[in-house]
Amino acid sequence: MVSRKPALAVKELGCISDRDLRQLQRWNLRAATPATDQLMHEIIHQRALEFPEKIAVEAWNGTFTYQQLDRLASHLASCLASRGIGSNDFVPISFHKSRWAIVAMLAVNKSGAAFVPVDPSLPAGRVIHILRQTEARVALACDKRSTAMSEAGISVITVADSMDCEHLDKPLWSPSFPGHNAPAYCLFTSGSTGEPKGCVVGHAAFASIASHSQSAYIHSGSRVLQFASLGFGMGLFEVFCTLSTGATLCIPSDEDRMNCLAHAMTSMNVTWTILSPTTLSTLSPADMDCLVTVVTGGEPLSESQVTVWAPHVRLLQLYGLTECSGMFTVSDQIFSSDNPERNIGYPISGRCWIADPQDHHRLRAIGAVGELLIDTPNLAQNYLHNPAKTAAAFISPPGWIEDQLPARQSRPAVLYKTGDLARFNLDGSICHLGRKDHQLKVRGQRVEPGELEHHLRQLFPAVGDVVVDMACPVEANGVASLTAFILQENECSDDLFVEPTEAFLECVQSVRQSLTKIVPAYMIPNLFLRLGTMPKTVSGKKDRRRLRQEVGLLTWDRLRKYMTVDNARGRAAHTLETESEKILAQIWADLLHLDVGTLGPEDDILALGADSITAMRAVAMARIRGLGLTVSDIFATPTLAEMAQSARVVPTTAVTTHRSVSLVDDNVRELCLSHLREQTSLLDSDEQTPLILPATGMQKFFLDRSSFDYFAYILDGDVDFDRMQAACTTAVNQHSILRTVFVQNASGIFQVTLSSIPTALYHITTARNVADVSEKLWSPNTSKTVTLDHPATRFMLVSNPDAQQHALILRLSHSQYDGLSWPNLVGAIAATYNGSALSPCLQFSDYIRCRYQQDTTAGYNFWRRYLLGYTPTHMRDCTFEATTQSKAVSTDSDAVNVHHTIPSPPDTPDGITMATLIKAAGALVLGQLTRRPDIVIGQTVHGRSSLPLAGIETILGPCLNFVPIHVQIHPTWTAERFLHHVQDSHIQTTAYDYLELADIIEQSTSWAPGTSLGAIFHHQNIDTKMEISLQGMKNSKTIHHLTGSYIHQQMRSEVWVYSMPVDQGLEISIRGSSHVISAPQADELARKLGAFVQTLARHPEQALVNIMAP
């Protein structure tokens, strides 16, 4: 480096090698991202032209399509323009969580101005300061915030439902072009001088958020939670990365956001969210099957959080700054064992270097700790009206920058000094290691301790010194609390911490109250500790580290002595009296790591360390115990006695089943029973009234096929016939679906569950091969059909005593089981034969009843939105080549059955299932054959993830279902992005995949009744040939035989695409009626599907336009 730059100052050399310099240059070349030419509101306008009817915003208070959002923002922009608002103006916006907040921000940018989010929780004094700094003339606010903003001294335009301009076809607004460097927004953060500082971001930097979607795994099918405050960078990222991609933004109410976040996310079918690890800790993946991607930031993930979440979602960690629009780095997908908790990943939108924290002219070697410096198109412009702070943070590039830039690349105007300590890992990823200054992070939000210390000095009487820091008591499970250390004047003690006087504690209460009028709630300390002395370092500075360390040695019980009023006054009325008080005391003891015996009814949980996050956890825990609380209840009534009085009794959410109650009326019940008495001998005089339920759509589908399924387990060894007979009888008693018969009358098809059926084990002895004999047994039944009013369940045992070989044959109708539940039957037989007790299980009737208990409104609304404007893709819409004759065609004159095997199929990309890969390939084939960008096909789902039924996995029965899936094909997408889109689209449907297809069509679409899905994809990833483990015998072979034709009444208008792993690779079968698809066409479909499966998996970087090219 010296030879290339002889004039470089010695101080700029540092201790970095030429090899490291070259590596940094390569890493930064990979990360460089060009700025966009479009402005954010132009990008969203383009999405409105592409997807006019698609839902852009789904909020608790209504929805907007992209067209509605764009038009309303244009109308509001014209209102602003008529008031003289334009480029370089700042417009404050203040909204509770609402769809109108999105309109407001977009409108301000369309007017050419910059929006300034003002969170409704901010105290009036801070709002006035923001208005004064921005010199704003007009603000936009919701109904509830209009008065408060007006009282702050500004003209307010109220933005609410009365503004709905849907019927106005031509917007009044005419495009304004503020310029790429004009301000787009300004965010205010904590400032070290006691006042917040405004960070101004220009239009070009703002628009660059659109380029982050692929790295964040946000695509047009995503449903993104809007959780963060719009006053923080991540709140804006949630909104504008979503809208610039054509995805849907989901906005719960403030109440749901704080009190029942998991429920809100599930009801809105959220697939993507960004949350701080602290907030994430209040949730469980078990409660949100809809979630696909979880991104965290602001704090490091704990190892326990990775363990909990990584197996269930795509887990990422990002790094962003207020001074950098959107994300700057994002990690690879995090798995349980291979990602350090502080690894923030790789730059996605610029370049970075790590320099000496005390001298940014000196670069640090790879692996050494230093200050992170960044250069990115996303960078903010300045701190509003604060040139000194701007100059200190946005620096001229040091001399070493020239050596780091590739040829013909322009020198950056500035670098941003983040103040964050970091180091490069050997793979180019970055580890975040804290701050070089005293800046704090509270639940992911930036806090300058100097600002709080300034206010505390003014508010505390007779204060000698103050320190604000994050401190973590020993029993806090690693959760640090914002802590104020107060040294009063004339205080003199050898003890670091001293017990508070009554006057001190009363002063703390007064100071808390005053702070609520000055700073945001998250900046109010949880703990106030009185000091006997202020520890100092050898250089005479306040020893913050020692204060943190000493708090880290305190148990909660010892800490209470330094912070509660009761300790100073003497404890009064300590006994918990009501059941609600006792329940709440146990909840808070668990959350705050206290001995429940030390809590009394007058204890203030806020004084004991509670905050909004622990309050959210308390709300959820209380609901489970039957108490209804909200976060606002907790803050309004912080003592246990008051809280117990404000709590409401709520029902628990467990599903209650009543097996003696039917879902059919008395007339239908009597018709069913009369039929069985007349046609069968199954009901005798001692028979209790059996359970009668409607047959599900899937049961009707399988009954229409009118065929039996046979499973033959070839067993080598000695069999105990009596034990086998008893095992089969026990299985029938265990699973009521095996005792079910079907009855059809004018009202439909119904299933009748009997208390018992004949369960004889038919025994056949032979000298021949038992497998051959078994096949002979079911061959004569090929033309027979399932009789509705007779049990399908039958057990047979074929034995060759000389060969000590047997075949245990189970016969059922597919209306009694599905692949996922088959092991429940086999396991029951094996457990009983082997002498083990059976575990309790639910019945298929519990599943049906749970389905009927669901409120279907949200489900039908989802399907209505999901399928709006789309229709199924049919074979008649395809243009086939159809030149190759199939080599494997069914002999059934009406049936086409083509097989295609992919030898050595490729592994699926990370995070993608084989079912997704096959559906994606199928959608591409249909897109190519129809030349359509939107494909709707059918998919088989197991139907067990969407119902709140604990133990649903123990049910034997056909819970599977057929539902539509909508796939979009964007030619510029890479294969990887397309695969994630297909998988995310599937996951969206899982919350409501229990609904009957016929009902979805009737309630949620304009399709004709009985519309077929065109093509239905079914990936068989369950081994129906699983072994049965019986004592003294070896299961040497399993045979699965399906009788009857593949084509029956309900299959005559659809093509079925089956896929299954086999020993030779992956087998793909195309089945259907010859009236729908010919054998050559089916062969063409199978071949193309196989080719696309391999290309998508092996070339994830390839664009769809190239993959689909003829």
UniProtKB/Swiss-Prot annotation:
- According to the entry, every stretch annotated as the Carrier domain falls at 575-651
Task: Enumerate the residue ranges of region (Condensation).
Answer: 713-1025
**What domain of life is recorded for the organism?**
Eukaryota
O-(pantetheine 4'-phosphoryl)serine is carried by which residues? S612
Which GO BP terms, alphabetically? amino acid activation for nonribosomal peptide biosynthetic process; secondary metabolite biosynthetic process
Q: Which PROSITE patterns match?
A: CARRIER (PS50075), PHOSPHOPANTETHEINE (PS00012)
Effect of knocking it out? Leads to the accumulation of the benzomalvin dipeptide precursor anthranilate-N-methylphenylalanine (Anth-NmPhe).
Q: Among the entry's GO cellular component annotations, what is one?
A: cytoplasm
Keyword set, alphabetical order: Ligase, Phosphopantetheine, Phosphoprotein
Family to which the UniProt record says this protein belongs? Belongs to the NRP synthetase family.
Q: What is this protein called?
A: Nonribisomal peptide synthetase benY
Question: What organism is the protein native to?
Answer: Aspergillus terreus
Organism taxonomic ancestry: Eukaryota, Fungi, Dikarya, Ascomycota, Pezizomycotina
